[in-house]
C-alpha cells in the first residue's frame, strides 16, 4: 500500500511514539501523524530496543555531561543530571539511588539526545525507561521541591527550531506553505473501541 517502507509517528519527531499500523487507532488524543521512511534516523532510534541502547551507552558514553548541560529542565534549575542516569543504567551501578530517582524529573523532550549527545546515544530513551520502570515498581521521587535558581548559562543554550530541524534531518520535509489535498476515503472496515 501507500505506507510500504514507511513508518508513522503519533506526535512530534522528538517526543512522539511509533504507531502500530495493524493495531493502533485514531482517538481523540491522536496528535499529528508524521510519515517517514523506515530508514530515517528518527525511526531507527525509536525502534532500537532499550537493551541495545544501554549496550551502546555502556560502550560509548564518555561522561562528557553534554546531555545534562543541554537539558532544559536542568537549565531551569531542577536537579537532573542525565549523564548520571545514563551511566548508572548502562553500567548497572546502583551505588547512588538519586541517579535513578532524578529521572522522574525528565520530561522526555529529547534535547539531550538530539542536541546534547555527540556520541549519537539516546539519553532520552534511557531516562524515560528508568522513569517508567521506577513507576511500575511504585517508586516515586518526591517532586515537591521547587527548582533551584535558573542557571545563568540557560540563555546561551536555548535551541532554535532551525537547529532542531537540521539535527533531526527533516529539513526537506519543512515547507513554508503546505497545499491541502482533500480525498474521499472509503475504508473496507471500521472498528469502534468501546
What are these regions (language model features)?
Residues 183-193:
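Charged/polar low-complexity intrinsically disordered segments, enriched in acidic residues
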Residues 1-179, 191:
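Redox cofactor-anchoring modules in respiratory/redox and cofactor-processing assemblies
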Amino acid at each position: 500500500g501507500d505506507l510500504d517502507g514507511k513508518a508513522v509517528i503519533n506526535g512530534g519527531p522528538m517526543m512522539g511514539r511509533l504507531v502500530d499500523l495493524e493495531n493502533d487507532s485514531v482517538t481523540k488524543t491522536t496528535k499529528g501523524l508524521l510519515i517517514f521512511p523506515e530508514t530515517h534516523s528518527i525511526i531507527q532510534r525509536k525502534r532500537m530496543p532499550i537493551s541495545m541502547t544501554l549496550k551502546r551507552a555502556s560502550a560509548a558514553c564518555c561522561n562528557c555531561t553534554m546531555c545534562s548541560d543541554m537539558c532544559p529542565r536542568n537549565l531551569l534549575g531542577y536537579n537532573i543530571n542525565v549523564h548520571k542516569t545514563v551511566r548508572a543504567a548502562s553500567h548497572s551501578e546502583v551505588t547512588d539511588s538519586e541517579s535513578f530517582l532524578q529521572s522522574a524529573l525528565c520530561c522526555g523532550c529529547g534535547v539531550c539526545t538530539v542536541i546534547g549527545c555527540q556520541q549519537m546515544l539516546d539519553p532520552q530513551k534511557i531516562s524515560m525507561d528508568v522513569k517508567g520502570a521506577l513507576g511500575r515498581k511504585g517508586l516515586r521521587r518526591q517532586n515537591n521541591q521547587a527548582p533551584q535558581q535558573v542557571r545563568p548559562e540557560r540563555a546561551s543554550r536555548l535551541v532554535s527550531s532551525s537547529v532542531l530541524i537540521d539535527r533531526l534531518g527533516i529539513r526537506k520535509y519543512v515547507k513554508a506553505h503546505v497545499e491541502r489535498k482533500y480525498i474521499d476515503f472509503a475504508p473496507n472496515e471500521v472498528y469502534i473501541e468501546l
